């Protein structure tokens, strides 16, 4: 692991909202007296009924209960739109950049208000009200944000299903939350290719009870010819012509659910993560402001999809609650060329950029040329999210993309946490490439060993969180017992993140990967992220994923999937070279037993590597790979199976 330290530059410190002394003071206050701390910061949003109770939380076995600001009432859409109209009605709220570089729009707060009210009225006319669930299955178009905020305006609960999910996955999620109304588009556009969204919705509904879904609202994106079921389906533009652009916002309790978002469970059955209104918005807006050092007038771009929690918290809710200008991108980093990200940054003068390590690594594989063709002079803060970023990719991001003048915030958090938990702050934190550094305000990480004993000082172990924070999920939809079992039964009175971590002598946290991504080689536990980082540090390697597989002698062997940089070819010589490289870097125990050169790795559209699939292939067991429709490129799996290194026959 890299222990290089990058000091806070004077330019970052001078304009930062928080310096090191302020961080330490605020952090100490947040953990010693959370009631007072969050009472103050809870007022960063507007309340129609002010709260008098701040924190009412318990992680006790059999009695897990999380409530924040519970006697207050508010409305998320009111906070994200209406309260800005007087002072910044004509400011751009959303910059939309289409898949095609010639398509973009600027949507002001006034326009956003009108569009959201219109969408809310369309929903209301179809019987949607407080507490009803609405499934959204949309591309990255402005209507996705309008639909989220329209549900929030009415007190309805949105459940977004990412546009890459199959009809089966969509059906199980519609059924899981009992949505009577689905909002979709005729087709999506992604990297120049069309995605048959409406056709997938039709397929999904066929798999459900006939009386479940009453209405399907279809946004015209491509104008493609799609089947419309009379009486059930309606084009959004036609329905919107029948309503006004004024709609009152429903004041809801702080603990009223805002959204359900399904995330993969270890059993393969997705869990409906429930986030509520008040605490979630306080936490999303506060982390957005301080982590990205957001100043009025900044242009902020998070490259995620709204189908993932990052898109919920850091494209829509956090930025808009702060009156920010947030960029929403329909496309992919490599279309029409692999300069696209950097061209968008120059086109819209982006100041803050938040993306995933997997995107950074894949662009890094194409060399510096595509980056250097652009200026990127507007950039000030670069963020990373989704998985641990290896030091080499961190360094490339810092040096090449940011010209060694932008602060990097390597953020660690989860769907379940609602917002960022461990992160540097641009004006406060010395940086170590590969480390998520220190906890955000109110977050108390603890390291425990396998027996649940709390570890002190520099150590490696299981990452847990002691005590609650306002953005924390409240339950698994319809299954509170599963919530308790999954997150609170492993270690008593602690929230177990499922991640392993290392804490160094400076109190910095290094996330080592999911605990189920730990390989046990001859009795030695090893985080896959460490071996992956070592492989990616080799000059010929663009990306690597490491999994365990059954080994006659060691119990588990190390199987590495390696994607090489453009222009490099895989060979037995290179295999040997990589084994020697890792052996030298980490030690003989970490030497890969099998290396498979792969043109690509199976990733979800949000960029997460599907390790479950890689493990199955490494185990020579690919008869039960499960649903691969969520992958960005399902064909990658066929290549991996075809060229696997561990054939039993």
UniProtKB/Swiss-Prot annotation:
Mg(2+) binds at residues 536, 538, 541. It is an enzyme of class 6 (ligase). InterPro entries: Ac_CoA_lig (IPR011904), ACAS_N (IPR032387), AMP-bd_C (IPR025110), AMP-bd_C_sf (IPR045851), AMP-binding_CS (IPR020845), AMP-dep_synth/lig_dom (IPR000873), ANL_N_sf (IPR042099). One of its GO terms (cellular component) is cytosol. It comes from the Bacteria. Keywords: Acetylation, ATP-binding, Ligase, Magnesium, Metal-binding, Nucleotide-binding. The modification N6-acetyllysine is found at residue 608. This is Acetyl-coenzyme A synthetase. It comes from Methylorubrum populi (strain ATCC BAA-705 / NCIMB 13946 / BJ001).
């Amino acid at each position: 692991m890299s222990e290089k330290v990058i000091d806070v530059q004077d330019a970052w410190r001078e304009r930062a909202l928080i310096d090191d002394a302020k961080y330490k003071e605020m952090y100490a206050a947040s953990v010693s007296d959370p009631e007072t701390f969050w009472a103050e910061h809870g007022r960063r949003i507007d309340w129609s009924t002010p709260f008098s109770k701040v924190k009412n939380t318990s992680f006790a076995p059999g009695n897990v209960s999380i409530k924040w600001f519970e006697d207050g009432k508010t409305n998320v859409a009111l906070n994200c739109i209406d309260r800005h109209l007087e002072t910044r009605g004509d400011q751009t709220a959303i910059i939309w950049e289409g898949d095609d570089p010639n398509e973009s729009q600027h949507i002001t707060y006034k326009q956003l208000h009108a569009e959201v009210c219109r969408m809310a009225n369309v929903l209301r006319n179809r019987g949607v009200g407080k507490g009803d669930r609405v499934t959204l299955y949309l591309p990255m178009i402005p209507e996705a944000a309008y639909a989220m905020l329209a549900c929030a305006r009415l007190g309805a609960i949105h459940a977004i299903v990412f546009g890459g999910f199959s009809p089966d996955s969509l059906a199980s999620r519609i059924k899981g939350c009992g949505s009577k109304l689905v909002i979709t588009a005729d087709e999506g556009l992604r990297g120049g290719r069309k995605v048959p969204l409406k056709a997938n919705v039709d397929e999904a509904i066929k798999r459900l009870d006939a009386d479940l879904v009453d209405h399907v609202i279809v946004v015209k994106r491509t104008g493609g010819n799609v089947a419309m079921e009379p009486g059930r389906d309606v084009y959004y533009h036609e329905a919107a012509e029948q309503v006004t652009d004024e709609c009152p916002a429903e004041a809801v309790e702080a603990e009223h659910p805002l959204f359900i978002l399904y995330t993969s469970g270890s059993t393969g059955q997705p869990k409906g993560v429930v986030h509520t209104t008040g605490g979630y918005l306080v936490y999303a807006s506060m982390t957005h402001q301080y982590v990205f050092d957001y100043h009025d007038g900044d242009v902020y771009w998070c490259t995620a999809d709204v189908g993932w929690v990052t898109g919920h918290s850091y494209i829509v809710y956090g930025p808009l609650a702060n009156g920010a200008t947030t960029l929403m991108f329909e496309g992919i980093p490599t279309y029409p060329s692999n300069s696209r990200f950097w061209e968008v940054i120059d086109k819209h003068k982006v100041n803050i950029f938040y993306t995933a390590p997997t995107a950074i690594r894949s662009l890094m594989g194409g060399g510096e040329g595509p980056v250097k063709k652009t200026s990127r002079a507007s950039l000030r803060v670069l963020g990373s999210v989704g998985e641990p970023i290896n030091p080499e990719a961190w360094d490339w991001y810092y040096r090449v993309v940011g010209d060694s003048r932008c602060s990097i915030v390597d953020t660690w958090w989860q769907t379940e946490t609602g917002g960022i938990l461990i992160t540097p702050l641009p004006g406060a934190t010395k940086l170590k490439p590969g480390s998520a550094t220190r906890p955000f305000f109110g977050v108390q990480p603890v390291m425990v060993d396998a027996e649940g004993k709390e570890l002190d000082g520099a150590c490696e172990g299981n990452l847990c969180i002691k005590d609650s924070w306002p953005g924390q999920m409240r339950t698994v939809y319809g299954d509170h017992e599963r919530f308790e079992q999954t997150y609170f039964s492993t270690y008593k009175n602690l929230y177990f993140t499922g991640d392993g971590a290392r804490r160094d002598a400076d109190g910095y946290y290094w996330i080592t990967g999911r605990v189920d991504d730990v390989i046990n080689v001859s009795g030695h536990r090893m985080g896959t992220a460490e071996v992956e980082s070592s492989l990616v540090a080799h000059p010929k390697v663009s990306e690597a994923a490491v999994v365990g597989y059954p080994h006659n002698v060691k119990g588990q062997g190390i199987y590495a999937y390696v994607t090489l940089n453009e222009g490099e070819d895989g060979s037995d010589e290179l295999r040997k070279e990589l084994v020697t490289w890792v052996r030298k870097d980490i030690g003989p125990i970490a030497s890969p037993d099998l290396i498979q050169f792969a043109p690509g790795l199976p990733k979800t559209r949000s960029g997460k590597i599907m390790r479950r699939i890689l493990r199955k292939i490494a185990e020579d067991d690919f008869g039960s790979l499960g649903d691969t429709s969520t992958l960005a490129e399902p064909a990658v799996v066929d290549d991996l199976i075809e060229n696997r290194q561990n054939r039993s026959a």
